[in-house]
Every structure is written in C-alpha cells, then in structure tokens.
C-alpha cells in the first residue's frame, strides 16, 4: 500500500536559497501539489543576492520535471543517468535574471554507457538541462588500452568533447607531492577541475592577472597579494545551511586556489622561456611562504594545497587578458553574452543595436554577440596544436600547481590520435583534462566563434560606438551582492 502523503505545500515569499532547498527536499519525499502565487514575480529586484528575480516559473519547472522523473521510475531506484539529469535540472533553474548562478561537474563510472552517451546526437533539443554539467569519466587506475580507446573514440564521436578525464589516482598522487596533505581520500574536483577536493569541501579562489610587461618581481608581488586574499577568505567557514562536515573539512585543510590568468600574454610564462620551470617554482614558493605567515597571524591551519590555474572565462573578459592557460580564441571572433529579457540592461543593449537573438535553450533569455579583435602580439588557440597545449599544461602541473591546471585542449582531427597517445602514455599524471573540437562542435550559440577580418569589419559597421547608460536603472541593487568567485553558489565560468 502506498503510504506517501499527498498534501498542499504553500510556498511563502522567497528571500533566500535555503527555503528553496527545503521545499525541494519535500518534493523528493512526498507526493504533493504546490501553489507559487506568493513567490515574488519575475523581474523583482533582489537586494541581498543582487540582480533580478526569475519568478516562480523555474521552480515550477523543476517540480514538474522531478514529478515526471519519479513517476517514470515508480517501483525501482533511479538510474545514474536519471540522477545526473535531476542534478542538471536543479543547476538549470538556479538563475538570477537569466544569469546562471550554478556550476556542475558530473563524475561517472568509466563503463557507464548511458552517461557516456548523454551528450551524443541532438541532446540539446531533447535534454537541454544536460548542458549545465561538465561530464568526466572517473578513473581509479590507468585503464587497459582497449577501454581507453573506446572512451577516446566516444569523445570524438560526441563532438561535444565529452566525457573528459578525471583520475582519482592521479589526484591522490598530486595531493601527496607537497607532504602537507592527507592523500588517502576519495578526491573529486570542482566544476572547472582545477581544485582537488575531498567530498563535502569548497574551493577558495583568488587570481593573479598576468600582464605582458610583468617581471619576476612584479609577479611575486601579485602572487603574494592573491595569497593573502585567499588566506583571509579561508577564515570564512560559517556555512549555516550545510551539514557540519562541510565546515570541518574546510577548516581542516584551509584550501586556497591561487591562480594565474593571462599566462600566454607574457613570454616569461610560456615555453619560449627555457627557465620556465624554475620561475614557476619561485612563484609557488612565494605563495607557500606567504600563506604560512598569514595563517599563523590568523590562527588557522596552513593550507594543504595552494596553487592552481583556473579557466578564468569571466575575469579574463573583465581585465582583457588571455583566459587562464589558454590562448586567445582567434585574431577575430564573436564573444556571446546572455541576458534576461526583463533585465533593464538587456533593453539598453538591444535598443543600442547590439546584435542579439533568442537563446535556443531559454526563450526568456537573449544572446548578444560582440565582435572582438585580439591584440596584435597575442597567442591564439587557433594557432596552437593540441600537443603544444598539453606540453604547457604539463610544465604548470609539475612546477606551479599543488592542485591542477584547468585546461580545455582544443583539437582537430589531424592531431586527435597523437593527443590520445600522449594522454595514455602520461595517464598516471593526468588528474583532469577536458577536450573540445576547435570547430564543428555540437554547441549552438557557443561563447566563442572564430570569424574572418572581413566579417569582423562588417559587424563593426553596424555596432554601436557608445551606450547611453543614463537609460539604465538608477537604483543600486548590487549592495550586499558582492559574491566572490565560487562562493555562495556563484562560479565565474
């Protein structure tokens, strides 16, 4: 006899994510109806979190998806793919004014065919929520050549660059190198795969922006400042909604994530420098000694792992640098940015004449296209082979990172097999790498798209020279919303 109680659960006015979490827990354990009439309407200002409310529609969408999924699994356990889809759907609805405030990585068993095939074919039409997760196969040891070959072929066939590689064994090996960390853990990683994490643990990121004119001394100073910021952030462990294990793990390891972005903008930090390894070790030691000093001052444990390279997709746009360890995308390219149709800024951009279109995955979101020209002396991803990207990754893994360098290796059919051979031969050191075809991938409205100089000039002819910001909202809704990277559910992907 079914003993699941059916009842009306009335949702009160929303002011925090904690209530949303509690209500969704009720969704998982009971059969219910819901009334969202008292949820604040779409477009309302969020004074604490910042931005604009998305209204009740995303929450209702999640509830309906969950009920449909559970009804389809009546009498049995959910499959790994169904659990994956549910997590993706949760991530999909965590939005503020059309801007996602979630990031997700899904680590799956090597031999799980369902998740291996999750982004094959026209998945973006039938299962669009899957676009919210980075999918990686989780390896506990080096696989046989046959197993690896099957997975490598599947990655190529998907044209989505998935699944990526996450090796728990290599992560344990990397964690053990500095002698400060308990490496016998079932490590995972954060969504961008630059931080080695225990279960129930956070990353804590800060960043050095590398400029072309930087010297060893100026880089040392920047690393020192970024490390101080990270060490101060490591004291912030009052996670009121989460279980105590999150606080315990975070305080025990006091992890940092001191990153470098704009690496390829400075010749000192590229493979052109024959002393690159020793330079990176000097910078790493600067971070370690700075953290040791400030940890003592603050009365917290010395960090068990400090340095990494994060992808830095957002920060690099803000400061006009190359992204993390990657080259600039191309000499000329389109950079796409999303905005909710109810956001006043969306109307400002649209009225000014910035090219835009409806988001294929969200009718309430518009995608704006900005033509971009890279600096003359820039290193371009379009000019790098996959092997060149991997060789640079290996140097930073060895000489800079106590965590990992996050990298998306862009490949072409001409070097795909060579890359696979290198990956297999170096598998014991590869804690996590993702791959993506440079072109012909399955992602519509991708963030970056290479264009020709002629296409760039054509786009610039109709592009507005300036914006009338006086047309924008006059009230300040950003107070209290200054969320740091990867804190409070916001990951700057």
Model-assigned labels for residue ranges:
Residues 29-34, 73-85, 94-106, 234-248, ...:
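Flexible, glycine/charged-enriched surface loops at secondary-structure junctions
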Residues 85-96, 231-236, 249-266, 309-315:
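Core structural elements
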Residues 155-158, 164-167, 174-242, 252, ...:
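Catalytic alpha/beta core of large soluble enzyme barrels
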Residues 1-214:
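Active-site cavity-forming subdomains of large catalytic enzyme subunits
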Residues 1-9, 44-52, 67-77, 206-216, ...:
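Glycine- and acidic
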Residues 477-493:
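Short acidic, low-complexity intrinsically disordered linear motifs used
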Residues 55-58, 82, 184, 194-201, ...:
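Secondary-structure capping and boundary motifs in well-ordered enzyme cores
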Residues 98-142, 237-243, 262-311:
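Internal maturation/activation junctions in enzymes
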């Amino acid at each position: 006899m079914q003993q699941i109680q059916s009842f009306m659960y009335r949702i009160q006015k929303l002011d925090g994510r904690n209530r949303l979490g509690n209500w969704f827990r009720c969704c998982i354990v009971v059969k219910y109806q819901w009334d969202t009439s008292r949820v604040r309407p779409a477009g309302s200002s969020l004074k604490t979190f910042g931005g604009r409310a998305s209204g009740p529609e995303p929450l209702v969408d999640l509830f309906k998806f969950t009920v449909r999924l559970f009804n389809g699994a009546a009498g049995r356990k959910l499959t790994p793919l169904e659990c994956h889809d549910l997590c993706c759907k949760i991530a999909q609805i965590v939005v503020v004014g059309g801007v996602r405030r979630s990031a997700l990585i899904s680590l799956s068993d090597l031999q799980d065919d369902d998740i291996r095939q999750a982004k094959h074919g026209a998945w973006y039409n039938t299962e669009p929520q899957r676009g919210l997760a980075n999918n990686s196969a989780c390896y506990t040891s080096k696989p046989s050549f046959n197993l690896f070959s099957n997975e490598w072929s599947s990655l190529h066939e998907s044209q989505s660059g998935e699944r990526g590689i996450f090796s728990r064994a290599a992560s344990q090996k990397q964690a053990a190198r500095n002698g400060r960390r308990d490496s016998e853990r079932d490590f995972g990683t954060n969504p961008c795969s630059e931080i080695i994490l225990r279960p129930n643990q956070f990353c804590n990121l800060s960043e050095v922006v590398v400029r072309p004119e930087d010297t060893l001394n100026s880089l040392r100073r920047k690393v020192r400042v970024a490390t101080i910021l990270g060490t101060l952030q490591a004291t912030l462990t009052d996670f009121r909604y989460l279980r105590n294990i999150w606080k315990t793990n975070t305080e025990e390891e006091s992890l940092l994530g001191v990153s470098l972005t704009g690496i390829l903008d400075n010749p000192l930090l590229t493979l052109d420098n024959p002393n690159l390894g020793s330079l990176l070790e000097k910078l790493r030691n600067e971070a370690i000694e700075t953290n040791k000093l400030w940890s003592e001052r603050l009365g917290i444990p010395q960090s068990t792992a400090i340095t990494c390279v994060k992808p830095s997709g957002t920060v690099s746009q803000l400061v006009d640098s190359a992204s993390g360890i990657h080259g600039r995308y191309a000499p000329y390219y389109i950079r796409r940015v999303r905005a909710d149709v109810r956001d006043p800024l969306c109307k400002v951009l649209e009225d000014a004449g910035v090219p835009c279109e409806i988001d294929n995955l969200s009718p309430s979101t518009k995608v704006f296209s900005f033509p971009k020209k890279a600096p003359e002396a820039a290193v371009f991803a379009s000019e790098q082979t996959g092997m060149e990207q991997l060789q640079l990754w290996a140097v930073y893994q060895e000489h800079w990172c106590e965590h990992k360098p996050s990298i998306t290796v862009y490949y072409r059919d001409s070097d795909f097999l060579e890359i696979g051979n290198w990956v297999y031969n170096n598998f014991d050191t590869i804690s996590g790498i993702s791959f993506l075809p440079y072109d012909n991938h399955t992602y519509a409205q991708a963030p970056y798209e290479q264009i020709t100089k002629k296409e760039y000039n054509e786009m610039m002819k109709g592009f507005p020279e300036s914006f009338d910001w006086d047309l924008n909202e006059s009230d300040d809704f950003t107070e209290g919303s200054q969320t740091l990277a990867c804190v409070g559910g916001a990951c700057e992907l």
